[in-house]
Every structure is written in C-alpha cells, then in structure tokens.
C-alpha cells in the first residue's frame, strides 16, 4: 500500500534583486522513498518579500496500513530585510 507524504519547501526572495534569503523544508524523513513527484510551483507576493512555494509529493510504500495521524507543530521561517528579521509562524 502506498501513502502520499507532502513536502513543502519555502524559498525566500527579496522582490527587488531576487536574492535568496534562506530555505525552509517541512518534509518528513521516512526510511526510504520510492519516487518523488513535483506537482507545482507558485509565487505569492507578501509586502516586499516574495515567497516561492514548491510542493512535492513523495510516495512511501509501507508493508501494512498504519495510523498516519501526527502532531503538528509550528512552522517557523524568517527573512532578512533592511530593517531586520521578519519572522513568520504557521
């Protein structure tokens, strides 16, 4: 049986010169992946910061069905600006 495990990667870019500010990867790390399928990429402008979001789905093959209910913590990522750090929490 195969399960789909989403992975989201945030790439912070400044809007004026497109300089990378940092990366955030929320993917989990099972012991092995069969394949990785990149679905889509989108760009959304927030104030003076562009956040490019790439979504990938990793197919994980498991020997038997299991409960995939996991606790969800805070996703925290930050960007540098001319006035200091901007910290976003989800």
Swiss-Prot record:
Protein name as it appears in the record: Uncharacterized mitochondrial protein ORF3
Compartmental location: Mitochondrion
GO cellular component: mitochondrion
Superkingdom of origin: Eukaryota
Keyword Mitochondrion: yes
Main location per the UniProt record: mitochondrion
Keywords: Mitochondrion, Plasmid
């Amino acid at each position: 049986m195969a399960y789909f495990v989403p992975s989201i990667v945030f790439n912070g870019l400044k809007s004026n010169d497109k300089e990378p500010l940092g990366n955030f990867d929320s993917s989990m790390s099972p012991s092995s992946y069969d394949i990785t399928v990149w679905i889509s990429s989108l760009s959304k402008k927030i104030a003076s910061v562009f956040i490019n979001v790439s979504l990938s789905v990793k197919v994980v093959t498991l020997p038997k069905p299991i409960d995939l209910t996991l606790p969800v913590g805070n996703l925290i990522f930050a960007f540098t600006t001319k006035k200091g750090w901007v910290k976003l929490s989800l």
